[in-house]
């Protein structure tokens, strides 16, 4: 039986690969997509997500979400993804529109209609998820688990200690990590290992139409290079759903720093149990890189 999932995203070049995997992995049933401000503005992430759904002729409802963090000024990652978020490929014009509901209400309604609890996957800032949990607490029993790309048990990528998705809205992340729902965190500890090699990247134009499109986008992606390999951060959250055997997880207490002058957005991961607090997150720490690369090749070959 396919696993029903809702995907919250901020496309973003590596988001495009994660969305492809969510659509074409035969083990998954992507039922709803929502967008959030992150890599670029929410207007741009929504446009990019609709372009991708049209490209793959995927009839999946999409709702636009939060345009700003809960309490902070927005930040973005245009330096990594380009000003549009997905520069490099000329997508065909379309007439698709997002749902009228804001993202967190669309998630609420879809959860309440679902016949069984649903897995939420969040690969951008956690603003929409925090709004859902704070404004609609009745939804919690309907969430099977939350799988995120975000955080780090060590170094950051937008500050010395903080990963971008968490640092973009630390208050939202803190709300989510305190919520009591089951969380799997695929942070930089594994996503920095999730590299597609130059040899594989060179085969993409001949793979299929998705390969051609991704190859064009990758030429504008700044998380690595076509010559040294590219890190597929967001794809790790989808990979864990399908191939959890590729990941080594450890249950840990995780809190989010919201006050520090230099540490705001840091995920404080208590790997050794120093704080004596019960674990609230399953933290991914290691990745079978070759197995991951093989799985990526298999799923993208299906993305026609």
Swiss-Prot record:
One of the record's GO molecular function terms: purine nucleosidase activity
The keyword Hydrolase is assigned to this record: yes
Cross-referenced Pfam families: IU_nuc_hydro
Entry EC number(s): 3.2.-.-
BP terms from Gene Ontology: purine nucleobase metabolic process; purine nucleoside catabolic process; pyrimidine nucleobase metabolic process
Gene3D superfamilies assigned: Ribonucleoside hydrolase-like
Name the record gives this protein: Non-specific ribonucleoside hydrolase RihC
Job description of the protein: Hydrolyzes both purine and pyrimidine ribonucleosides with a broad-substrate specificity.
Name of the top EC class for this enzyme: hydrolase
Keyword terms of this UniProt record: Glycosidase, Hydrolase
Taxonomic lineage from the root: Bacteria, Pseudomonadati, Pseudomonadota, Gammaproteobacteria, Enterobacterales
Protein family according to the UniProt entry: Belongs to the IUNH family. RihC subfamily.
Active site: 233
